[in-house]
Design a protein with these regions (language model features):
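Pre-Walker A-like glycine/lysine-rich segment at the N-terminus of P-loop NTPase domains
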Residues: 1-40
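Short solvent-exposed loop/turn micro-motifs enriched in small/polar/acidic residues
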Residues: 2, 59-62, 100
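A broad, low-specificity signal marking well-ordered, structured residues that form hydrophobic/aromatic
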Residues: 9, 15, 65, 145, ...
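Short amphipathic alpha-helical segments, especially helix-boundary/capping motifs
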Residues: 9-11, 54, 174-180
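Conserved P-loop NTP-binding catalytic core
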Residues: 10, 29-87
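A short linear-motif detector with a strong N-terminal bias
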Residues: 14-15, 43-48, 57-60, 124-127, ...
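Residue-level detector of secondary-structure boundary/capping sites
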Residues: 26, 71, 191-195
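Electropositive, glycine-dotted interaction segments
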Residues: 77-236
Length: 238
């Protein structure tokens, strides 16, 4: 079965993106990688060069990033906007997506303003005080995401309504896994099983990759280093 149903919403378990060379397929993956990096580690320095540089005025324009996700059988939309050339956050938001096409605001943030909690988020007085303190601290912070700050050494119970910040953050941290052609294999255990290796070879043959066989050979480190480019060998060693 290629579909999964969550709250009467049918979702594909997998999808494939097709397109001509240089049509933007890789950029889709890079955008997701960029969002994950911003949430987990902060805005990278190289973001300054990521805007569309074919026009000079683009340096001052906003770029908008948003994902719709499923976590704990609930649907969320999370996103942020920034002026890439300045590494400056201009907006940030999170909504719970409800049945019937409605959306309930979790929080919104505009440049120079503290984040605002959604009116329908019913939290305790203690949690509301916590949120307000955290939000006020972000008023003039244009280089960090509020989602990141809400997951940095904050004492938020899993039973609190504010735990939604932890759930969305956890999706970026643990559920969004990105592999690129240069990602090294770190676990070869699957290949040491004869049945698994046979399955791998059968799949590779059906993909028409030009690879005829995958097998396990015992080689010395010297043999491996002599057969591979230095950078690939170092990836394997590390």
């Amino acid at each position: 079965e290629h579909k999964v149903t969550i709250k009467r919403v049918n979702l594909l378990k997998s999808a494939v993106v097709y397109g001509a060379n240089a049509s933007g397929k890789s950029n889709l993956v890079e955008i997701l990688r960029f969002m994950k990096y911003c949430v987990l580690k902060g805005i990278p320095l190289e973001a300054k060069q990521m805007y569309c540089r074919n026009k000079e005025e683009n340096a001052g324009k906003e770029s908008v990033f948003e994902v719709q996700i499923v976590k704990h059988n609930k649907f969320y939309a999370y996103g942020f906007s920034m002026i890439l050339s300045q590494r400056a956050i201009t907006g940030e938001w999170a909504y719970e997506l409800l049945s019937g096409g409605d959306a309930q605001m979790i929080f919104e943030r505009e440049a120079g303003q503290p984040p605002q909690l959604g009116d329908k988020i019913n939290i305790s007085a203690a949690d509301r005080t916590k949120f307000q303190i955290y939000a006020d601290d972000m008023s003039d912070n244009k280089n960090s995401l509020f989602l990141s700050e809400m997951n940095r050494n904050k004492n938020i119970s899993d039973h609190s309504k504010l735990a939604v910040f932890k759930r969305i953050f956890d999706w970026f941290s643990n559920d969004l896994v990105i592999y690129s052609p240069n990602t090294p294999i770190t676990n070869f255990e699957y290949y040491y099983d004869a049945d698994s290796l046979e399955t791998v070879n059968r799949l590779i043959e059906s993909f028409d990759t030009g690879i005829s066989e995958v097998r396990i050979d015992k080689l010395s480190m010297e043999d491996i280093s002599s057969k591979l480019p230095k950078e690939i060998f170092m990836d394997i060693v590390e």
